[in-house]
């Protein structure tokens, strides 16, 4: 019995030691959202390798398939699209040189529901809609896979008006890749 008590005491001391050495809080201004305000946190490295060139045009199709465990939180794939915009603009690439299309399907499908239908399904307002609106203002096309809408038994008119209803993610991704877009799975 004493061995068990000694082991448990040692384990508790070790756990306390680990939690005492937890990472410090980030200082103010450590993370920024220079273009898509409030979304897609970045910590810019001005001398980082593989920095985008301001004069180039960047064409990316984001394949958003991940869902979210918390329906009241922004979909992490959509937040990564915002992060990508923020990184390119922070590197000096003008928004007009970014040709970004983000297509949602699979577990990401619900992110494009209008607020009424998202509330009906999840009991909370759709937290993705403000970000979708900001991305659209920045020139990003948010698309929804029509086949995924059908698979989820959603109606097509339940999709938010800021979202483009695509025939499918399969055809969207391959069509855009044929047009020179780089695929970024999220």
Show where each model-derived region lies.
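N-terminal signal peptide c-region/cleavage motif recognized by signal peptidases
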Residues: 17-20
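Solvent-exposed, acidic/flexible segments
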Residues: 67-77, 125, 166
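Bacterial N-terminal signal peptides that target proteins for export
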Residues: 1-8
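Structural recognition of the beta-strand scaffold that forms the well-ordered cores
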Residues: 59-63, 100-104, 141-144
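Acidic helix-start/capping segments at beta-turn-to-alpha-helix junctions
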Residues: 95-112
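Histidine-anchored nucleotide/phosphate-binding helix
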Residues: 74-93
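Acidic/histidine-rich, surface-exposed loop or edge segments in extracytoplasmic proteins
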Residues: 53-71, 112-116
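A cross-taxonomic marker for long C-terminal extensions/tails that follow the last structured domain
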Residues: 9, 13, 23-28, 32-37, ...
């Amino acid at each position: 019995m004493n061995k068990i008590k000694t082991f448990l005491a040692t384990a508790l001391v070790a756990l306390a030691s680990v939690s005492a050495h937890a990472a410090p809080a980030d200082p103010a201004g450590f993370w920024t959202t220079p273009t898509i305000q409030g979304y897609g946190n970045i910590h810019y490295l001005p001398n980082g390798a593989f920095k985008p060139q301001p004069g180039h045009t960047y064409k990316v199709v984001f394949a958003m398939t991940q869902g979210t465990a918390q329906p009241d939180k922004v979909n992490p794939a959509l937040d990564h699209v915002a992060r990508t915009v923020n990184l390119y603009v922070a590197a000096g690439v003008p928004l007009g040189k970014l040709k970004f299309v983000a297509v949602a399907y699979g577990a990401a499908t619900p992110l494009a529901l209008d607020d009424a239908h998202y509330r009906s399904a999840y009991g909370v307002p759709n937290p993705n809609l403000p970000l979708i609106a900001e991305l659209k203002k920045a020139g990003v096309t948010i698309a929804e896979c029509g086949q995924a809408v059908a698979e989820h038994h959603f109606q097509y008119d339940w999709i938010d008006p800021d979202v483009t209803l695509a025939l499918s993610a399969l055809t969207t991704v391959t069509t855009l890749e044929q047009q020179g877009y780089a695929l970024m799975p999220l």
